[in-house]
Amino acid sequence: MNMNNMTGRPSIDRPWMKYYPEVLRNLQIPACTLMEYLKMNCPGENVIAMHYYGNDIKWSTVFEKTEIIARALKALGFGEGDQIPVFLQAVPELVYVLLAAEKIGASLLCRDNTLEENVEAVRKSGAEVIIAHDYLAQNELEKYLSDSSVKKVVLLDPCYSCNREDMPDYIQNTLDSRYPEVKAGGSAVLGWDEFLAQGEKFDGEAEAQTNVDRPLFRAYTSGSTGPSKQVIHSAHTMIGVVHQMNFYAGTDDFRPSWMIACLPPALIAVTVSGILMPLASNKLLILNPFCDPMDIDLEMMRYRPNSFVMIPWFVENIMHNGRIADDYDMSYLLAAGVGCEAYNNKQLENAQEFLKAHNCNARFTTGYGSSEAGSNMTLPLSPHPMGNGNVGIPTLCNVISVFKPGTQEELTYHQMGEICVSGPGLMLGYDTPEATAEALQTHEDGMVWLHTGDLGYMDEDGVLYVQTRGKSPRHGGGDLATLPMENRLADAEIEGINDEFFVVVPDDEHRGCFLPYLFVILKDGYTVDDIEDEVRDCLDDYMQPVEIVELSERPFFHFKTNRIGLTQEILSARNTWRKNRRTVKRAVAV
């Protein structure tokens, strides 16, 4: 783009398009079903679509199983517009059930939270049947039967599509740990073979009228930044995400492998970008759902995938488990990067150095997306160096810009504001119209924009820099944007700090304000006293942490840095201190 013709509004200028080849710039999203889309991109029915613990599954099997399961779902009473609660990990049957739900006009409902939250989701769905793994406990089954309309539960053995003996011992151990003392049983339970048999017998019409815009996939946000909400996607919106990435496809000469490990399909990014995208782009999909996150290094070395879905927790384990030899060759890894949460400059430097030390020349990148946007919103295609929140440029059909928080007023380049996106992957909405209206807003340009709640800015080349989640003002002035604060410390290269991150908690003495706490992971032989002066010297006054706390390692919960848990600990300790202080004051008064 000619810089002289720029308006100063990213949504109009779209400067990022210069990084895409001319042939891709008019990319159109197909208006078709997921099944039609996968068949359109299928390299051949005899080609292996998925590998699952020693079992190679051909595309022909995917199509055949989908047909049988669609009829089985109809036999159980599911039909057009119904919600099918599914509590499966990323096993082959998850793919079949998703495609079968589409065929009968229903939608999958996935949730991976507490039992109470899962039961609540099922109750709201009105479903009388749920699908789960056979490690469902009897007390869990009874909870579904008593607190929702569920009458039947279809149970699947995780090894139905593989031989258990083909799993490494540590995978078997992880799988075994999921089984309770008393498994679900009784008249309400239907085994997988019994379920399939019902499909074989069903002789009615299974296929609903095609509607690519009806709900197909429902999942819940993680709740890491607020109350968990149900996000609803259609075949059209999911294809809207996948189609913007699948031009990185396999060829007749080289077919890359892609591993998805540990992560549950109840995370929209896992189902859309982690499973559907590789299937639609001629990659060999390696399903590895029962790998413990602490064993991700072993599975990486066993499968040697060309790429796999990484999150910061996995990278930490790979670097620090101590099982990867100094001379181990990781050159098979052709792409490497993380999503899921912000990644500061110190983390980025550590990861890039680790790759380089192990003969991997891939540039370690950070991505950006959300459940509401269908997962990936950006790609790391610009030559700009990674770091400082750089998450790349908008994907081909997405328009991303920055707006004054709480408004629809678009800001110009390098101005901090709320990140908003408009594109074909946006959710249909939440399960409540009020929340949907707040998140999806039609602007004066006639486009529907998702207001993400994230803060950041865009430069003149269209590179997006994500800085923090929401505003966190400190009493007396200054906004506690966590990533820039962490990067300030990372760039200072303070001797003794291996990793560091901030947790921002409510200031109970000043309503609407917040206080920062700094957590550090130190090198051997160092203490907080050794680094505190340098830490405070490089931070502005409003950034000064209330306390610097040493941890042995970065804590994770539900695949993200456990800021929620640490916040609860801080608030609990603060309340205990105040309670003790009041007790002392009363004693002194007496």
PLM feature spans:
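Conserved AMP-binding/adenylation subdomain of ANL enzymes
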Residues: G105, I239-W258, A266-V309, H320-R323
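Conserved AMP-binding A3 loop
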Residues: K58-S60, E207, L216-H243
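AMP-binding/adenylate-forming catalytic core of the ANL superfamily
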Residues: V122, I130-Y135, G423, L428, ...
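Conserved C-terminal "lid"/linker of ANL adenylate-forming enzymes
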Residues: F501-P506, Y517-I521, I531-V590
